[in-house]
């Protein structure tokens, strides 16, 4: 599923998370950020709440295992919850919730990431870009709409793309290490991402941190190794998905 998503994203017009990520994934498989022998397992199922451990591997296989149970449970009980811990980057969160909406479910997803957003007025990153996504089912197995947005003005991967392409970033996307606005993507990666809507974006980041990391038992963003470069071991971040049946 990791490969399927990576190949599909450029079709959606999402270049920053598509095929450009293949070299990064390969690098992280070689350096140990991703466990090449990962065997995700269901840790527990209590009523309609499922917990999966990704074993420091890609999030996608762990999410797949959880979704096998999540959809049927949501339809049988009206709503169900899946948490995933100890996972690597899950790619575009909206892709996952859209899969649930294709099964006729309203789906909400959360995923935390290594810290890259500082509190309003601060300089030290505390939470990650921490996206939240919503998918609503439509007709003929198609989603009526999918909302996928991060707690930052723009995804961190967009900054990484600008570094690779040697292009500047718009003012207001990120701050340098001194907390000043910068248009240099390299300086932005040394500093912090600008929260969307100021303190409100940081608040969304905290909400996602609770849902994706605290509830799942994953590593908090402030302690997780980065999704870029080779420093540190597996980031062991987490995800949380809520599935609701409109027929309940």
Residue positions per predicted region:
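Internal helical hairpin/lid segments
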Residues: 191-248
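Active-site cofactor/substrate anionic-group-binding motifs, chiefly glycine-
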Residues: 18-71
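A generic, well-ordered mixed alpha/beta core segment in the N-terminal half of proteins
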Residues: 51-139
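Residues forming anionic-ligand binding surfaces in small-molecule and nucleic-acid pockets
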Residues: 42-53, 64-80, 175-190
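Short, small-residue-biased leader/transition segments that mark boundaries at the very start
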Residues: 2-9
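Predominant activation on well-ordered alpha-helical scaffold segments within soluble catalytic domains
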Residues: 8, 22-27, 68-71, 98-101, ...
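Acidic, glycine/proline-rich low-complexity segments that act as flexible tails and inter-domain linkers
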Residues: 15-33, 161-163, 168-170, 177
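Phosphate/diphosphate-binding glycine-rich loops and adjacent basic-rich segments that engage nucleotide
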Residues: 116-186
């Amino acid at each position: 599923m990791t490969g399927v998503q990576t190949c599909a994203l450029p079709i959606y017009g999402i270049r920053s998370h598509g095929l450009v990520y293949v070299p990064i994934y390969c690098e992280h498989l070689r350096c140990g950020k991703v466990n090449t022998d990962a065997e995700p397992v269901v840790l527990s199922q209590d009523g309609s709440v499922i917990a999966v451990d990704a074993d420091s591997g890609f999030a996608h296989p762990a999410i797949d295992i959880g979704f096998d149970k999540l959809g049927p449970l949501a339809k049988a009980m009206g709503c169900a919850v899946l948490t995933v811990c100890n996972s690597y980057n899950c790619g575009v969160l909206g892709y996952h919730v859209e899969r649930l909406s294709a099964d006729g479910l309203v789906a909400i997803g959360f995923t935390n990431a290594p810290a890259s957003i500082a509190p309003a007025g601060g300089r030290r990153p505390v939470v990650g870009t921490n996206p939240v996504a919503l998918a609503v089912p439509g007709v003929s197995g198609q989603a009526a709409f999918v909302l996928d947005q991060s707690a930052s003005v723009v995804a961190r991967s967009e900054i990484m793309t600008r570094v690779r392409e040697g292009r500047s970033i718009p003012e207001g996307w990120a701050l340098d290490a001194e907390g000043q606005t910068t248009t240099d993507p390299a300086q932005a990666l040394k500093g912090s991402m600008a929260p969307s809507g100021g303190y409100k974006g940081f608040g969304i980041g905290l909400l996602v941190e609770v849902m994706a990391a605290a509830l799942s038992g994953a590593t908090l963003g402030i302690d997780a190794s980065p999704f870029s470069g080779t420093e540190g071991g597996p980031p062991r971040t987490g995800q949380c998905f809520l599935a609701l049946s409109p027929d309940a």
